[in-house]
Amino acid sequence: LSKDLAKFDRIGAATLEQAGLVTKLGLALLFLLVVWVGVTIVSAGGEQRTIVIIAGIIGGYMALNIGANDVANNVGAAVGSRALTMVGALVIASIFEAAGAIVAGGDVVGTISKGIIAPEDFPNSDMFIWCMLSALLAAALWVNIATMMNAPVSTTHAIVGGVIGAGIAAVGFSGINWPKMGMIAASWVISPLMGGVIAAIFLAFIKANIIYRDDKIAGAKRWVPILVALMAGVFSAYLVMKGLKRVWTPGGWTITAIGVAIFAATYFVVNPLIRRQANGMENRNKSVRTLFTIPLICSAALLSFAHGSNDVANAVGPLAAIV
C-alpha cells in the first residue's frame, strides 16, 4: 500500500509540475498576443507595417527572455535572504525596471540602435531593417536556450554579438563602428572587476565595523542607516545627472549638493527605524541579518532601476532602429 501511495504522490507532483509549465507557457503566449495587438493598433499603415508588427513580437519575445534570465540578478539576494517574497520582489522589479528604462535608458537604446552599425552604411533601409531583425531574433533564441539550461548569461553580450554578426554578414567588417565596440568590450571587463572590488571593500567594512565587533547591534545601529543613506544619495545624484538631462543639465556642484541633501534626509528617516527595530535584539549575527532587510530591499530596487536603464535597451534598441 505504501508503494502505491508513493506512486500516486509522484504522479500528483508530476501533474502539478506540468500544470505549472503549461500555465507559464500560456502567460508567455498571452503576453506576446498583447504585444501583437498593441503594435497592430499603434503602427501606421503602409508596406512596413507587417515588418513593424513582426519586430514588435520578436522584441516582446526578447523582453520575456531578459526577464526570465536577468531579473534574478537584481532580486536574487533579497529573495534568497528572505528579505522579500518572490511576489514582492517581482513587483519591485517590474516597477523599477520600467522606471529605469523610461527615465534613463535613452543613451543605451541609441548605442544599440545606431551606435554599432549605422543605417547610412547600408545600401538601403530594408537591408538595415532585416539586419536588426536577425540580430534581435538570434539574441532572443540564444538567451531562451541558455535560460532553459539554467545558465545565467548576458543579454547585452547576446544582442551586441547579434548586431555585429548581422552587420558583418550584410556590409562587411567596415560597417562596424569598431571604436565604439572597443569601448563596449572594455566595459565588459571593467564592470565585473569594479563590481568585485567595490563589493569586497563594502564586505570588509561591514565585517570590521559590524559583524566582528563585540557589540554587533551597536555597530549595526550606527552604520546600517549610513549605508542606506549612501545608496539613496548616490542614486539621486545619478538620477539628476542621467535621467533629467533632457530637461535640466545641472553642474557638478549642484549634483553633489542634491546627493548630499538626499543622503541627509534618508539618514534622518532610516536611523530611527533601524534603532527601533534593533531594540531588544540579541547580540548575534542572526539579529544583524534582520537589520539588513531594508538595505537589501533598497539595493534590489536600485539594481532593478539600473538594469532597466541598461539592459532593457537590448530589446528596445533594435526595435527602435526598425521603427
Each model region followed by its residue ranges:
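Alpha-helical transmembrane segments and immediately membrane-proximal extracytoplasmic
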Residues: 1-323
